[in-house]
């Protein structure tokens, strides 16, 4: 850095010691700090951009003493010339530190003039000059006897001709110069020249340009960097001037050699006592210098502890009226600049800028700065000029062309975002702001002196600060000082206002705060405050939104977000001086600005304040900009010698797409790349293929080389024009869209700014924040703050309250927290309503629980309707829905009625069970206490229609019970169902079925009746059969047994059950599939697929009883013994649920059923009682199959067939069925429902596809080669399992029925078990016409409907006998042992299987159609 020329002579204002560095750390010379001493003269080599100047000290001393380094720019100021001297000879500089001048030129001399080399300057050129080449301007007045000067020559007079002046001595470098001891012994240095008179000093001050920037010093002509160290060989001396004509005695002295530069240092220091407290140093310049610029400027702007931005040596910019007309409001004296200010109306430095408003909008204007004001005027709008005093400047920074300025105003911090025309202008604006801010804030030093009680030393008369203070005192404007520097008014009226608003009752122990925004009281207990007021915070704990404050003896509440509390240090720090009020004023002013600085830097904004959040976002943006500034500064400060492009060679370069532009200097072209030097000093290389053709033409012009192909350019141009023609409309639309989007964004941004302009929103008034609070006491009725302060703490245990309401304990804590936050207590419980609970975060279910509990506390009844209402309603719904709901168990949400705790007597009829249930109340009891809410949707509503329906339904079970009582059913069947199932008792509408006409039309109308009857009957019968003897099967197999026992019950006790049983068999047929299917799923398919058949069958079933009764006597007479066997069918049916047994056992009884089916004529069954049952066999037959299945499935043993083969076997049979039944019920019943449903479902579709299989599809699907007996086996599969095709009974039974039933029994016992579930696809109809006729009327084919009698089986009686005897199916005795018909079963056989349902047969009762009456339809 030694090769830098001197660009200025500066004087040190304050001593400075450099920061200590690590011994091993290497710091460049341009970043190394040096120590300076007050009043020392230093030479300025370079001005840094970060408020640090590169200087050289002891430049006119020995080389060993020279130091080069950086010092704070605000610690030095431009030196004033100590005197003026005149050049005696021409001199040409020999090194970079020297200066060239011509003879007779007037030079300004700085510092000591007695040394051999002195610092001089002229025309903004500075350097060292030989002392013997110049003379003082007052030499003519010196006496003639004056001794020779230090140069060894007599000082010539001004009028002396040059020819009389002796030639200068030859120049010797300092290293080669002779020591001082080599001077002649008679050499006596002359006394120093007297100081210039005051008049000349003032003239010099007046002649010196005041504008620091406008009078920028011109750098001396650049010298090639060929400077050699001072230790090099001596340079040849310049030719001496012509010798002046002087007396001979003076010629000897004229030949004295030029004095060497190794004379001792500068003259004596001025003994001015140092100031008591020097300003703190600016941020240390680290190696990367990343924190100098922004750190210094921001810290100086906010704190007195660190020096302000670099101060300007002068403050005169000229008369602003000669440069710029400012539109200002005449009444705003504090803002308007004063054109009559000191120092001859200081001028404004101005720049053209654009103010950035919002995202896209900009306003063009002119920024003017002088040492008193900062003015922004707008040239294209009529907006008034914005004027800010320099003392309001808080912060300033720049980022390339963007300048960010912040001012402190009455309304808070005002931010200004300006866009300069170039980076240079932005840098100049920042420098000017630093100068004026430093000049204004230097007054703080006087306040520090006053506060510390130490007198401020007098400034040198030639210092810039002295001139500034003197001018301010003379003008009497803001920024001046009193003559004794007691107090500064640099902060204007705002500091006075802050002092006026100082709380009078404040003390050291009270908490203080600063008001951020104006607040106007709207109530008696509120306090009106202004921004920047200092208030005493009396209480800030009672409420988080409102603080009680005191100011000027008045107390009131103020929004907490309008006050900035002081830190502990601020609150505890006492005023530094109270003698004259100056210290307290300073303390208040410092705390005020410190709080503003903290508020601006930390942005402790409350989230509820939009204004604060906006400021926070601005702060974040500012931090980003600061980081960028630091990065750029670090880059700039790494090396002050970073080369910048020549501004005269800059041009704008554009890429081929036109999207990117850059200002850079062209360096050269090579390797198909264009080398550019950008304005920021970065050098880049851009491929020529990416550069625009216009720039390529420029490169070709500069280099003379061909850079691109003209053909390629032509193609690109054509392509662009072609694309432009197609995309013009699209681009036009896009531009419109962009404009619209910009407009929308602009409007939105303006609205946001308008919202952000005001202070933050005030919190809710204290009385409205907590509606549940108790009213304030009378003594504080007019003080909202006292109400908040005295609010009691909520102690009610809401957690326990919610637990008592039945709320889940996992959410009670959250609800409790919400209630406590709202300060609710037990007094609020009566007024709780669903809306309030919902607002407090309760779930809907919990709201109902809480409201029920609240109603109980309020005396409002919340008991639900009696249990009979939902039961009755569900029963009615089941009846109306065709029994579908009855088939599937339905969970009733209503509570269990009283019979659960007090079960009915065992023999109580179903009617009593129903009557015992309480009837629902007609209306809901009204609350005795007034309710505070109208929403009672959660309360139980009165039920009107269901009770009416229930009353009609409850009558029917009585009738059914009476009819059932008339039947010979065992006591177990009469037992009522368990109290927990009251809905199983009623059997709907049996009388209607009795009275129903036989016509087809009426049968279709009453389709729904049998279906519900069937489930009801099933339930009753099943309870009779399964509940008492086999409790194991009651619960798990309850559903599967409903229909099957009912449907099959008629066959076992055909005579007794037919009144209802036949209604049941028909439902069984219709729903027989349904129950099985319904139980799991099959009810729906069954209803759908078989419904038509059911419809047809139901009337048949109703009418079948008489026919069968008519036939039964014949059958009874003929086959009484078989009637004994007949019960086996029920046994099988009971086990039929298992699905496989019916065939095994069913064969025994089935011969009847089968014969009836095969023959299709009732006559054949007529011979046998079993045949009568067989007539019902369409129903019964399938039950047989079903009944048999249990043996096959349940027994899975060959023995299951033995009962069928031999009459004796029944003895073993009963045991087998029982065992099988148990097995079936446990496993068969569980698995059976699924199999039967599945099977039934498929079987239903089989009849649908085949007209002959309309009924259950069993017989029609039989194979011609299949035995009659096998048909029976299939039937139970169909009936009981709802699909005979799905079992292997029929599959293996395709073989002809052999006389030896052992063979078939094996199929049932062995083969059938593994093959269960397999369909019988090969079966086809094998019936003689007689059998088909019988099937058809029974419901397998609708063609026989017209033959229905009252009970449904309308086959001619004559047809029943004859064919029966010849038909192997009708007359099973042909294939049975002779004693088969005489076989009997044990008395307990049927009871053990199905609960004793066959007790009638054991008693010897016989059914006779001739004795049948309406009350005794079976003719027992």
UniProtKB/Swiss-Prot annotation:
One example of the protein's molecular function in GO is:
ubiquitin binding
Cite a single Pfam family from the UniProt record.
Answer: DUF1720
Q: Which residues form the SH3 domain?
A: 5-81, 82-139, 508-568
Q: Which residues carry this modification: Phosphoserine?
A: 309, 311-312, 454, 573, 577, 927
What's the protein's topology in the membrane?
Peripheral membrane protein
Q: Where is the composition biased (Polar residues)?
A: 152-165, 250-271, 287-301
- Basic residues bias: start-end ranges: 589-600
Q: Where are the stretches annotated Disordered?
A: 138-344, 560-657, 708-786, 902-1016
Q: Where is the composition biased (Basic and acidic residues)?
A: 326-336, 601-636, 709-742, 969-980, 991-1005
How does the annotation summarize its subunit structure? Answer: Component of the PAN1 actin cytoskeleton-regulatory complex.
Looking up PANTHER family in the UniProt record yields: ACTIN CYTOSKELETON-REGULATORY COMPLEX PROTEIN SLA1, FCH AND DOUBLE SH3 DOMAINS PROTEIN
Protein family membership: Belongs to the SLA1 family.
Name of this chain's protein? Actin cytoskeleton-regulatory complex protein sla1
Q: Which organism is it from?
A: Schizosaccharomyces pombe (strain 972 / ATCC 24843) (Fission yeast)
């Amino acid at each position: 850095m030694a090769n830098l020329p001197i660009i200025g002579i500066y004087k040190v204002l304050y001593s400075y010691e450099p920061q200590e560095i690590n011994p091993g750390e290497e710091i460049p010379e341009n970043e190394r700090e040096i120590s300076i001493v007050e009043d020392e003269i230093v030479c300025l080599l370079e001005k840094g951009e970060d408020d640090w100047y590169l200087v050289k000290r002891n430049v006119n001393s020995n080389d060993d003493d020279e130091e080069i380094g950086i010092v704070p720019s605000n610690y030095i100021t431009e030196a004033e010339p100590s005197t003026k001297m005149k050049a005696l000879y021409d001199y040409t500089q020999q090194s970079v530190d020297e200066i060239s001048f011509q003879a007779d030129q007037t030079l300004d001399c700085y510092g000591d003039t007695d040394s051999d080399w002195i610092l001089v300057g002229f025309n903004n050129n500075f350097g060292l000059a030989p002392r013997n080449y110049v003379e003082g301007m007052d030499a003519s007045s010196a006496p003639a006897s004056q001794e020779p000067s230090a140069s060894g020559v007599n000082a010539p007079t001004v009028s002396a001709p040059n020819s009389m002046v002796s030639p200068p001595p030859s120049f010797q470098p300092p290293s080669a110069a002779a020591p001082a001891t080599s001077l002649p012994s008679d050499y006596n240095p002359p006394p120093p020249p007297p100081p210039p008179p005051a008049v000349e000093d003032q003239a010099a001050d007046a002649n010196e340009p005041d504008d620091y920037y406008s009078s920028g010093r011109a750098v001396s002509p650049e010298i090639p960097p060929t400077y050699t160290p001072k230790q090099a060989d001596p340079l040849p001396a310049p030719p001496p001037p012509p010798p002046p004509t002087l007396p001979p005695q003076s010629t000897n002295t004229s030949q004295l050699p030029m004095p060497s530069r190794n004379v001792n240092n500068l003259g004596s220091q001025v003994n001015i006592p140092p100031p008591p407290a020097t300003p703190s140093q600016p941020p240390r310049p680290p190696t990367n210098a990343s924190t100098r610029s922004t750190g210094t400027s921001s810290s100086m702007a906010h704190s007195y502890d660190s020096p302000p931005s670099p101060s300007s040596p002068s403050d005169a910019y000229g008369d602003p009226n000669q440069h710029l007309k400012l539109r200002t409001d005449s009444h705003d004296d504090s803002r308007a600049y004063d054109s009559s200010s000191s120092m001859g109306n200081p001028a404004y430095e101005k720049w053209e800028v654009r103010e950035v408003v919002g995202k896209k909008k900009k306003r063009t204007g002119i920024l003017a700065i002088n040492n008193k004001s900062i003015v922004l005027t707008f040239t294209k709008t009529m907006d008034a000029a914005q004027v800010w005093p320099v003392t309001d400047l808080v912060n300033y920074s720049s980022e390339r062309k963007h300048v960010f300025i912040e001012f402190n105003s009455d309304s808070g911090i005002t931010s200004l975002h300006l866009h300069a025309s170039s980076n240079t202008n932005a840098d100049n604006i920042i420098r000017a702001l630093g100068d004026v801010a430093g000049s204004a804030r230097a007054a703080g030093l006087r306040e520090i002196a006053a506060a510390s009680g130490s007198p401020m030393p007098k400034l040198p008369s030639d210092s810039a600060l002295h001139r500034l203070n003197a001018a301010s005192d003379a003008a009497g404007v803001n920024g001046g000082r009193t003559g004794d520097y007691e107090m500064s008014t640099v902060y204007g009226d705002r500091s006075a206002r802050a002092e006026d608003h100082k709380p009078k009752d404040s003390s050291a122990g009270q908490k203080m705060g600063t008001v951020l925004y104006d607040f106007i009281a709207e109530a008696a207990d509120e306090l009106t405050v202004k921004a920047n007021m200092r208030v005493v915070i009396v209480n800030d704990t009672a409420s988080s939104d409102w603080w009680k404050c005191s100011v000027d003896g008045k107390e009131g509440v103020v929004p907490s977000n309008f006050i900035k509390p002081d830190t502990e240090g601020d609150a505890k720090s006492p005023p530094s001086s109270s003698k004259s009020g100056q210290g307290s004023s300073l303390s208040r002013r410092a705390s005020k600005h410190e709080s503003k600085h903290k508020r601006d830097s930390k942005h402790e904004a409350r989230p509820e304040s939009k204004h604060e959040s906006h400021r926070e976002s601005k702060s974040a943006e500012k931090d980003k900009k600061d980081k960028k500034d630091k990065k750029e500064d670090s880059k700039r400060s790494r090396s002050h010698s970073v080369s910048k492009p020549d501004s005269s060679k800059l041009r704008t370069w554009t890429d081929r797409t036109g999207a990117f532009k850059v200002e850079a200097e062209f360096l050269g072209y090579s390797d198909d790349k264009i080398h550019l030097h950008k304005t920021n000093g970065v050098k880049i290389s851009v491929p020529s293929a990416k550069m625009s053709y216009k720039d390529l033409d420029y490169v070709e012009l500069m280099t003379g080389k061909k850079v691109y192909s003209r053909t390629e350019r032509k193609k690109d141009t054509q392509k662009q024009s072609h694309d432009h023609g197609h995309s013009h409309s699209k681009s036009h639309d896009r531009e419109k869209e962009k404009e619209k989007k910009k407009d929308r964004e602009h409007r939105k941004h303006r609205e946001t700014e308008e919202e952000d302009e005001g202070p933050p929103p005030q919190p809710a008034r204290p009385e409205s924040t907590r509606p549940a609070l108790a009213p304030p006491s009378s003594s504080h009725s007019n003080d909202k703050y006292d109400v908040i302060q005295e609010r009691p703490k909520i102690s009610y245990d809401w957690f326990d309250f919610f637990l008592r309401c039945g709320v889940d304990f996992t959410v009670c804590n959250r609800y409790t927290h919400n209630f406590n936050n709202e300060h609710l207590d037990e007094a609020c419980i009566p007024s709780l309503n669903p809306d309030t609970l919902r607002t407090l975060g309760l779930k809907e279910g919990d709201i109902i629980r809480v409201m029920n509990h609240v109603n109980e506390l309020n005396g409002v009844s919340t008991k639900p309707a009696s249990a009979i209402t939902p039961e009755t309603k569900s029963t009615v719904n089941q009846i109306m829905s065709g029994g579908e709901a009855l088939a599937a168990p339905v969970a009733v949400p209503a509570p269990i009625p009283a019979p659960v705790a007090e079960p009915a007597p065992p023999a109580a009829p179903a009617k009593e069970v129903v009557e015992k249930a309480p009837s629902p109340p007609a209306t809901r009891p009204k609350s005795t206490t007034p309710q505070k809410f109208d929403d009672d949707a959660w309360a139980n509503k009165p039920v009107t229609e269901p009770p009416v329906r229930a009353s009609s339904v409850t009558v029917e079970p009585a009738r059914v019970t009476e009819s059932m009582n008339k039947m010979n059913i065992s006591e177990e069947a009469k037992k009522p169902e368990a109290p927990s199932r009251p809905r199983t008792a009623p059997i709907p509408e049996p009388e209607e079925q009795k009275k129903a006409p036989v016509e087809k039309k009426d049968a279709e109308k009453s389709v729904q009746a049998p279906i519900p009857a069937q489930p009801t009957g099933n339930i009753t019968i099943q309870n009779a059969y399964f509940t008492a003897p086999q409790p194991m099967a009651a619960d798990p197999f309850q559903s599967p047994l409903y229909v099957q026992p009912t449907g099959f019950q008629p066959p076992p006790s055909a005579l007794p059950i037919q009144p209802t049983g036949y209604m049941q068999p028909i439902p069984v047929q219709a729903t027989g599939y349904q129950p099985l299917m319904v139980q799991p799923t099959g009810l729906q398919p069954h209803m759908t697929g078989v419904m038509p058949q059911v419809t047809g069958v139901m009337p048949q079933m109703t009418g079948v009883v008489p026919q069968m009764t008519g036939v039964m006597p014949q059958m009874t007479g003929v086959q009484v013994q078989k009637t004994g066997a007949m019960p086996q069918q029920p046994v099988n049916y009971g086990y039929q649920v298992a699905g496989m047994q019916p065939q095994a056992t069913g064969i025994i009884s089935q011969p009847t059923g089968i014969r009836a089916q095969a023959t299709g004529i009732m006559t054949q069954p007529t011979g046998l009682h079993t045949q009568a049952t067989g007539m019902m066999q369409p129903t019964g037959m399938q039950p047989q199959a079903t009944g048999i299945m249990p043996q096959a499935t349940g027994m899975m043993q060959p023995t299951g067939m033995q009962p069928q083969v031999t009459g004796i076997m029944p003895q073993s049979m009963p045991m087998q069925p029982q065992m099988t039944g148990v097995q079936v019920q446990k496993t068969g019943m569980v698995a059976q429902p699924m199999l039967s449903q599945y099977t039934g479902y498929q079987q239903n579709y089989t009849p649908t596809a085949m007209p002959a299989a309309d009924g259950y599809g069993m017989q029609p699907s039989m194979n011609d080669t299949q035995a009659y007996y096998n048909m029976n086996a299939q039937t139970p599969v169909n009936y009981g399992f709802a699909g005979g095709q799905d079992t292997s009974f029929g599959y293996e039974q395709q073989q002809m029925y052999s006389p030896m039933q052992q063979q078939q029994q094996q199929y049932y016992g062995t083969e059938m078990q593994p093959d269960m579930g397999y369909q019988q696809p090969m079966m086809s109809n094998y019936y003689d016409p007689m059998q088909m006729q019988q099937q058809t009327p029974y419901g397998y084919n609708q063609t026989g409907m017209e033959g229905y009698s009252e009970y449904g089986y309308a086959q001619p009686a004559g047809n029943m006998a004859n064919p029966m005897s010849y038909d192997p199916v009708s007359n099973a005795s042909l294939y049975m042992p002779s004693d088969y018909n005489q076989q009997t079963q044990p008395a307990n056989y049927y009871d053990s299987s199905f609960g004793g349902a066959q007790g009638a047969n054991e008693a010897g009762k016989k059914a006779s159609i001739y004795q049948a009456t309406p009350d005794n339809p079976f003719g027992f």
